[in-house]
From Swiss-Prot:
Involved in ribosome biogenesis. Required for normal pre-rRNA processing in internal transcribed spacer 1 (ITS1). May be involved in the movements of the replication forks. It is found in: Nucleus, Nucleolus. GO terms for biological process: maturation of SSU-rRNA from tricistronic rRNA transcript (SSU-rRNA, 5.8S rRNA, LSU-rRNA). The gene is SLX9. It comes from Scheffersomyces stipitis (strain ATCC 58785 / CBS 6054 / NBRC 10063 / NRRL Y-11545). The keyword NADP does not apply. The keyword Nucleus applies. Residues 1-45 are annotated as: Disordered. This is Ribosome biogenesis protein SLX9.
Length: 194
């Protein structure tokens, strides 16, 4: 029966703590008024500490300590003293190893597939000035036009200038006054072909 009954001392403890706190506050006020003579930095609640450092100074201290920690801990070559180019080379090798190799593909295909026949083989011969045919390389059909690169800013500007000139030429064209859409269509076709 003694274990089932509890004393209600928690409320008394709270009230005694509050009264003790109030008495400490009043004592602190009296001491501070006597010592400082009601100084400007006096605050009603003695439990709140007046900050001696401004907010900007605190932030500056935090950033300084953080930067110092970074300088001591981090080096820019964190990958166990391997240069960036070496890491790139390794990655490139790994990618190349993943790609299928043509030799392996050729060995896996049947041999009779690649046997040369007279009908399938053709040799390219170029006629010379003297009239005799010699085997040589096929000339590239792609012409080097030295076109501006649209991906770069300077090339983009050049393309815009060219297009503006083309558009003004289309507007000056007498066909444009008769039928604007057909003139634009023809100009676009010419631009794509040339």
């Amino acid at each position: 029966m003694a274990g089932g009954i509890r004393k209600k001392t928690s409320l008394r403890d709270k009230s005694s703590r509050k009264s003790g706190l109030a008495s400490k506050i009043s004592e602190f006020k009296q001491q501070s008024t006597i010592e400082n003579g009601q100084d400007e930095h006096f605050h009603e609640n003695p439990l709140l500490k007046l900050s001696k450092i401004s907010k900007k100074e605190k932030q500056q201290q935090k950033t300084d300590t953080f930067n110092q920690k970074l300088l001591h801990k981090v080096t820019f070559n964190t990958s166990s003293n391997i240069s960036k180019s070496a890491v790139r080379r390794r990655k490139r090798k790994e990618k190349e190893q993943l790609k299928p190799k043509m030799d392996e593909l050729l060995t896996s295909l049947p041999d009779d597939m690649f046997a040369p026949t007279a009908a399938s083989t053709t040799t390219i011969r170029r006629a010379t000035k003297t009239g005799e045919a010699t085997s040589g390389y096929v000339k590239s059909t792609k012409a080097n036009l030295n076109l501006p690169n649209a991906n770069k800013a300077t090339g983009h500007k050049q393309i815009l200038k060219q297009e503006n000139k083309n558009f003004t030429n289309v507007l000056k064209n007498p066909e444009f006054r008769q039928s604007p859409f057909s003139a634009l269509k023809n100009a676009i076709k010419e631009n794509l072909q040339g």
